[in-house]
Design a protein with these regions (language model features):
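Compositionally biased terminal segments of proteins
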Residues: 1-245
Length: 245
């Protein structure tokens, strides 16, 4: 099986899910219909066109135990990385047991695998809860807002507040930086223009962290990563100022 080379797109996602349904049925899963709830990048590429790919598929899985074997077999067949379809996010802060309730039907594969997704304000709420400055969280929020505006179905701040409340109990569970971000982007309203700027910033932050990790291996944690990015940028800015003097 290959490592770290898998790319999932809106085009091939359905092919892989269809293959999983086929293998699950062959393994005897037809006695227990299965359900997947796609979240994160997989939910973005399933519902929207602004993002081309994701490198893994995060999901909530309701199925017989053979589902794990079916997923691994499809991974072997298509040379996908280990954990290409996983439930790891359920151990993160963005998980909520209420995601099942607020997910939306997507498609059924093989007459046995029902797939649902999280979208619109609920996906935005999850991205705000996660709030990673070096991933696609903020650019995904901008992209979702932009697409809904194009569709003539704009997402309001009231809807986002309701989603945050339904999933996490209220804004107190969302970081101050994420709250400031959503307030500013909603007030600005230029979602499409902002998307490219934010995405570039995320890529810069990722490169910054790679550089930091090279100098200080193992020093980065989920608790200090935002402070590291902020401090590193301040240091870079000071150095640039000194070079200009």
């Amino acid at each position: 099986m290959s490592s770290d080379s898998s790319v999932f797109t809106g085009e091939n996602l359905n092919d892989y899910l269809k293959a999983v349904a086929k293998e699950y049925k062959k393994m005897g899963g037809k006695a227990m219909p299965a359900e997947l709830i796609l979240i994160g990048g997989a939910a973005v590429i399933a519902n929207y066109g602004f993002r081309e790919m994701t490198t893994d598929i995060d999901a909530i899985i309701h199925a017989a135990s053979v589902m794990k074997d079916a997923i691994n077999l499809v991974g072997d067949q298509y040379h996908l990385q280990n954990g290409w379809l996983n439930t790891d996010f359920m151990r993160t802060a963005s998980y909520s047991p209420k995601l099942d309730q607020y997910s939306t039907y997507y498609r059924t594969f093989g007459g046995i695998l029902s797939v649902r997704t999280v979208q619109a304000e609920y996906l935005i709420a999850m991205k705000l809860r996660s709030g990673r400055l070096y991933k696609n969280d903020r650019s995904d929020i901008a992209g979702i807002l932009a697409e809904h505006e194009k569709r003539g179905e704009p997402i309001t701040m009231d809807r986002i507040t309701q989603a945050v409340t339904n999933l996490y109990g209220g804004w107190e569970q969302i970081s101050a930086s994420s709250q400031l971000f959503i307030q500013q982007i909603m007030q600005n309203g230029e979602y499409q223009k902002t998307y490219g700027v934010i995405r570039q910033e995320e890529q810069d932050n990722k490169e910054l962290l790679i550089s930091f990790e090279g100098k200080y291996p193992g020093a980065t944690t989920s608790e200090n990563v935002e402070r590291i990015i902020t401090d590193f940028k301040k240091k870079q800015k000071r150095n640039q100022t000194l070079n200009w003097l």
